[in-house]
């Protein structure tokens, strides 16, 4: 599949807006959701705080904020990648931003007449509120009092967590975050409905960054309009229970909040407790001003319970879906029953990639023919079957045949499989290498024996690694696999180039947002060596001085810095196509990885749910603003 670059590097791209969601006759009712107590907690003080550290795979509330409680300048529809769900669209903004010729200034025009939820229903959302939200995100990060995860589900790769990762490119952001200034000069309020964002460097994925929860607007404090963080002032340990919504829903009881009182004396929204969360319709929200969200149901109720209790409720119809996911046993039971099978929704987590990294500075992997041979010798379908057999969650894993998660490339390479399992072709590639002297397809060099392979140790690996051992033995490579149960230790070893790990079997990456810029600029440049969570294990782009300093005998490795810089110079869909082309180049000419898998999603829904889309723009969750209930079933 060859992709030709198209489009202009000076256009923001994105979609102006989809067709407005048509409110069907089946709209209304209460959506009943379960949260498995084993995986999720509502006791974290940072729950529903837009400024809390952002980890797309960790935070269940990222979806709740997007779908229901806050609006941002740009956002997403809550649909699957294939349905355009990962395309940026205007939300608070009336259109996609205008960019200056040097692309260092992005100007957003906000929609007029948008108001906050009660008790501030008379307060219009303005550009100053967006500035206030970003400044609070920077300030909270400085004080480090908001440090939770918004309800932890699992760990992740990616570069998420610190918002400075995303917003440091805004002029003056870092100085403000360090407490050196009292404002961010790069955030210019031109007027109530116009915001100009001034950057220190060209950042063509800024739109995705401003769609994150940390840029959500915060209204001014009616008691003290000069309060730097508005109604969130004084709530450094967690703003969620006091949040004034801008989306189609609000927390039950939020209309009784008293933002004019001192923060310490303010009552919490009664709809957020340690065991439950209830969202109700925001009467200030107007469907005609929101082209992204269907917001069909009137009320959404979450309850924390044991997994077994949640699954019984789903079977009995008292629970509509388990937001944190059903067990493998429940999914398999439904799939085995022809009447129940249609109630299972399956799909891929288009945000993640699991891969094996080959170190291009360690023989025999300094030879591209060996790296191609390894890809061809890897029996992907068998590895996936074994892994899923020994994984307890219903999500499981599915195949991925290229580098970047599909959501970051708008599905351009979804069906790409550069190296299907082919033992004969693997031997042919090995025979072309400098490590097969007699050209019989089997490596006969000592470097192919006892190859150091690092692996995680979550439980399934001792079974799945047999696929690697069997496949590589046939081309003359034997592995010395070291499994590390401690995640911190595994990460420390992965990030240290002096460990000379030849193959890293447990590498994993989760995108921060549906754009591949972070992945390529981290995992395939020297900037990704050390200090990054799951960085550049393959050492692509490392210079000769570093290779010598780290004790490698190899003096050069492939470099794609120029290709990455070219892609970074594009914007919108032109950049997306460029990433897809670079993905293909890496897989065919550089071959630093064996792409192994993406995570899969399996969701069971009640019979009365007649719409059950999956949001793939912020990882993968049921899209609560797009779910609908059959009329008369409440």
Predicted region positions:
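Aromatic- and charge-enriched surface segment that lines or borders ligand/interaction sites
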Residues: 57, 95-165, 196, 303, ...
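Extracytoplasmic/peripheral linker and loop segments enriched in polar/acidic and small residues
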Residues: 24, 372, 384-387, 414-423, ...
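Ligand/substrate-recognition segments at binding pockets and active sites
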Residues: 272-276, 292, 433-511, 598-601
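Gly/Pro-rich hinge or "lid" segments in bacterial periplasmic/extracellular proteins
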Residues: 77-83, 156, 181-183, 192-193, ...
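Extracellular/periplasmic solute-recognition and catalytic clefts
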Residues: 149-163, 169, 252-280, 289, ...
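Structural transition elements
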Residues: 391-435, 456-463, 570-573
């Amino acid at each position: 599949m060859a992709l030709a670059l198209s489009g202009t590097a000076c256009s923001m791209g994105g979609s102006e807006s989809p067709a407005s969601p048509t409110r069907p006759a089946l709209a209304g009712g209460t959506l009943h959701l379960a949260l498995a107590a084993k995986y999720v907690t509502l006791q974290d003080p940072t729950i529903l705080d837009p400024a809390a550290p952002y980890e797309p795979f960790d935070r269940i509330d990222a979806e709740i904020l997007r779908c229901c409680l806050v609006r941002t300048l740009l956002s997403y529809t809550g649909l699957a990648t294939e349905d355009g769900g990962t395309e940026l669209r205007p939300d608070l903004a009336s259109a996609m931003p205008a960019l200056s010729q040097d692309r260092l200034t992005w100007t957003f025009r906000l929609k007029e007449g948008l108001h906050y939820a009660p008790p501030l229903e008379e307060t219009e959302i303005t550009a100053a509120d967006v500035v206030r939200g970003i400044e609070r995100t920077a300030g909270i990060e400085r004080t480090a009092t908001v440090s939770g995860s918004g309800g932890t589900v699992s760990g992740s790769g990616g570069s998420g967590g610190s918002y400075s990762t995303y917003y440091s490119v805004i002029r003056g952001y870092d100085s403000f975050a360090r407490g050196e200034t009292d404002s961010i000069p790069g955030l210019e309020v031109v007027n109530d409905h116009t915001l100009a964002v001034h950057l220190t460097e060209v950042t063509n994925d800024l739109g995705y960054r401003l769609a994150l929860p940390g840029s959500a607007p915060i209204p001014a404090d009616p008691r003290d309009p000069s309060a730097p963080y508005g109604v969130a002032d004084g709530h450094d340990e967690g703003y969620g229970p006091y949040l004034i919504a801008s989306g189609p829903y609000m927390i039950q009881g939020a209309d009784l909040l008293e933002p004019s009182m001192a923060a310490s004396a303010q009552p919490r929204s009664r709809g957020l407790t340690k065991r439950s969360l209830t969202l109700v319709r925001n009467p200030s929200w107007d469907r005609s001003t929101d082209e992204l969200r269907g917001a069909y149901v009137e009320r959404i109720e979450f309850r924390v319970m044991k997994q077994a209790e949640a699954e019984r409720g789903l079977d009995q119809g008292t629970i509509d879906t388990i937001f944190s996911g059903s067990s493998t046993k429940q999914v398999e039971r439904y799939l085995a029953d022809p009447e129940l099978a249609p109630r299972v929704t399956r799909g891929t987590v288009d945000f993640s990639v699991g891969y094996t990294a080959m170190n291009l500075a360690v023989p025999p992997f300094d030879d591209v023919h060996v790296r191609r041979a390894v890809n061809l010798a890897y029996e992907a379908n068998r590895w996936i079957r074994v892994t899923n057999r020994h994984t307890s969650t219903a999500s499981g894993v599915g195949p991925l045949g290229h580098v970047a998660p599909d959501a970051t490339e708008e599905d351009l390479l979804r069906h790409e499989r550069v190296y299907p399992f082919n033992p004969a072709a693997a031997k042919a590639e090995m025979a072309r290498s400098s490590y097969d002297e007699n050209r019989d397809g089997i490596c006969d060099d000592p470097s192919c024996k006892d190859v150091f392979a690092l692996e995680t140790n979550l439980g399934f690996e001792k079974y799945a690694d047999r696929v690697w051992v069997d496949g590589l033995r046939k081309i003359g490579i034997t592995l010395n696999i070291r499994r590390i149960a401690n995640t911190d230790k595994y990460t420390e070893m992965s990030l240290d180039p002096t460990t000379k790990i030849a193959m890293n079997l447990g590498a994993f990456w989760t995108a921060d947002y549906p754009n591949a810029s972070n992945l390529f600029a981290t995992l395939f440049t020297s900037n990704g060596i050390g200090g990054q969570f799951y960085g550049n294990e393959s050492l692509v782009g490392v210079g000769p001085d570093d290779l010598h300093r780290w004790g490698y005998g190899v003096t050069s490795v492939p470099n794609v810095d120029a290709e990455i810089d070219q892609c970074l110079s594009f914007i919108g869909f032109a950049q997306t196509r460029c990433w897809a082309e670079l993905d293909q180049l890496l897989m065919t000419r550089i071959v630093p990885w064996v792409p192994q898998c993406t995570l899969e999603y399996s969701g069971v829904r009640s019979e009365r749910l007649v719409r059950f889309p999956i949001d793939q723009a912020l990882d993968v969750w049921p899209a609560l603003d797009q779910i609908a209930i059959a009329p008369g079933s409440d």
